[in-house]
Structure formats: structure tokens, C-alpha cells
Amino acid sequence: MAFKVVVSDSKTGKSYQFETESNALIGKKIGDEISGSIVELEGYKLKITGGSDRCGFAMRHDIHGAMKMRVLLKEGPGYNVKEKGLRRRKSLRGNTISKDITLINTKVVEYGSAPLGGEPESTE
């Protein structure tokens, strides 16, 4: 199963996309820290912040498991509130990565020795 892993760098404000065939991500949850070596980033430590499945349904941290559910929302990830007090039932994925997930969002927690984007760092 191929995963697209988006790595966000909070220092530069840029994000980088990698692909991996690793099954080491299956079973991990939102908030777990993983090694950057899974996406060829030696020395980096990444934190899983979200993702989406093959149909485009977003993952949500407070839905436990890997299944898709229709939940009633009033705010938070997966729902943009248009009016105050408005609630809506939305289809969302759970917080666990399974074979149905295609996109995984991560952020850098610990930096490695090599630059993230592949371009050399300036010495200015």
C-alpha cells in the first residue's frame, strides 16, 4: 500500500511530499511520533497530525479506530462552521492509519543533520 506523506516544516513554513510503501505506518494513530527514516529523512522525528482516505474523507483525532463514521459536528477538523450554533452530520475517518488511508500529514518534531528540502542551507 502506497502512502503519500506530507511533512510540514514549522521553521520555514514549507511542506514536502514523499511516497512510501512501508507497512510500519499501519496501526499508528494521530499524535504518535514516527521515525523520519520511513520517508528517507534520516535523523528526523515526525508527529502524525492527520490524513485522509482514498475517498477524501478526513481523519479526526477523537474518533477511535480506523473505520469511517457519520458524526454530528459543531466545530473542529473536518467541518467549517458557517453560522453560530449550526451542527451538521459529516462522514469522517477514525484516528488510526489503515490500508484505506492514502495521505498522512506530519510535522517535524526533531530535525536531522541533512536539510529537509534537499537544497543546501545558506550560511548567511
Curated annotation (Swiss-Prot):
GO molecular function, one term: structural constituent of ribosome
One GO process term, biological-process aspect: translation
Signal peptide: none
Keywords associated with the record: Ribonucleoprotein, Ribosomal protein
Pfam families reported in the protein's UniProt record: Ribosomal_S6e (PF01092)
Superkingdom: Archaea
Protein name: Small ribosomal subunit protein eS6
Protein species of origin: Methanococcus maripaludis (strain DSM 14266 / JCM 13030 / NBRC 101832 / S2 / LL)
Gene this chain is encoded by: rps6e
